[in-house]
């Protein structure tokens, strides 16, 4: 019995010692864990090198082909009045010491009161207001550059080269009275005759007094042939005869004048449609081009005229006359923006050589030339 008690006591002592050892081991483990956690908290985070975001590649600078000196001079002289109008007003705005939000608002007013059409005006204004940063808006150079770029975009109407390889190439010329239609035909005849073309004019405006005589005078000056009809006669028959003559006698171009009553005259539209049908009977596919002559001095009314004609007729080109005598030359922008019809020629003076193929780059450069923007209106 005594031995059993002794063994029990020894077992209890051993058990107590084991518990003490385990307790100490547990305390050491907790202490170590706390120390490790503390070290982790106090350990400075690794510095991760963050590379600055790469700046987006700058947009390629627009390459604008400069016109030759002679062309630039002609455009500059012909656009003097327009440059002295709304462009000069813009020049005064951007000439301020500080360009601010109020200046941009004034630009909107200038554009919308210019004869460039509301669509083109809004397109240019939004390109400046929304297309430039706040910093850029403080730079007159950046504003001018944006105005020029947007104007070039507006004028970038698809304009395939005139294909005169068809023999004869038949050109139908439209326009209301007084826009310079007959004079334009005479100048075109002179220009193409100088290129060695065999030209035949067609006096298809049989209703206007002296229209045939005027075209006949141009035929003499250009030394080209003409087909005439009877006064008040059927324009379609005159044009039919002319095209047949052009085919039979191997002419290069047949240029057809047409009646030019007011664009609101429904009877005129019917007559012009008949002319087109008859032309196609005389030569399949004729007319190959139909150009409309507009007077720049009429401003936005020119756009209205063209819209009315275009609603009933296929217009493939515009000739804009009298730019040199008008402050409304910016109407070219409205014509291209709203009609999507290419401007083929512009009139920059009275001489035959002043009727020039339209060069959008030369037009924009000489119209929005900062050096000339302060010219007197």
Segments and roles (model prediction):
Residues 1-153, 166-167, 194, 373-377:
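Non-catalytic terminal/linker segments enriched in charged/polar, low-complexity residues
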Residues 119-122, 148-377:
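P-loop/Walker A NTP-binding module and the surrounding RecA-like catalytic core of P-loop NTPases
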């Amino acid at each position: 019995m005594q031995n059993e008690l002794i063994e029990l006591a020894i077992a209890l002592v051993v058990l107590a010692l084991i518990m003490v050892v385990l307790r100490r081991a547990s305390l050491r483990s907790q202490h170590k864990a706390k120390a490790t956690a503390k070290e982790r908290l106090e350990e400075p985070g690794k510095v991760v090198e963050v590379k600055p975001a790469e700046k987006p590649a700058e947009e390629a600078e627009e390459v604008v082909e400069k016109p030759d000196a002679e062309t630039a001079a002609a455009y500059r002289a012909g656009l003097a009045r327009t440059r002295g109008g709304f462009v000069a007003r813009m020049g005064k705005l951007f000439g301020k010491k500080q360009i601010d939000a109020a200046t941009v608002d004034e630009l909107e007013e200038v554009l919308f009161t210019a004869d460039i059409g509301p669509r083109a005006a809004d397109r240019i204004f939004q390109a400046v207001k929304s297309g430039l940063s706040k910093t850029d808006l403080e730079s007159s150079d950046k504003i001018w550059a944006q105005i020029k770029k947007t104007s070039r975009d507006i004028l970038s109407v698809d304009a395939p080269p005139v294909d005169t390889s068809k023999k004869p190439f038949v050109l139908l010329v439209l326009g209301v009275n007084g826009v310079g239609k007959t004079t334009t035909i005479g100048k075109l005849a002179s220009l193409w005759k100088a290129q060695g073309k065999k030209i035949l004019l067609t006096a298809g405006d049989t209703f206007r007094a002296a229209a045939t005589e005027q075209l006949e005078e141009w035929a003499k000056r250009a030394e080209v042939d003409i087909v005439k009809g009877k006064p008040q006669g059927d324009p379609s028959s005159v044009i039919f005869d002319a095209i047949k003559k052009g085919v039979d006698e191997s002419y290069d171009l047949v240029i057809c004048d047409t009646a030019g009553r007011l664009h609101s005259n429904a009877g005129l539209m019917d007559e012009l449609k008949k002319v087109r049908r008859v032309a196609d009977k005389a030569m399949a596919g004729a007319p190959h081009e139909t150009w409309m002559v507009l007077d720049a001095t009429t401003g936005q009314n020119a756009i209205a005229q063209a819209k009315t004609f275009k609603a009933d007729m296929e217009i493939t080109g515009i000739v804009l006359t009298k730019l040199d005598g008008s402050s409304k030359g910016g109407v070219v922008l409205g014509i291209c923006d709203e009609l999507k019809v290419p401007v083929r020629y512009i009139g920059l003076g009275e001489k035959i050589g002043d009727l020039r193929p339209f060069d959008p780059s030369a037009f924009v450069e000489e119209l929005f030339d900062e050096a000339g923007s302060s010219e007197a209106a």
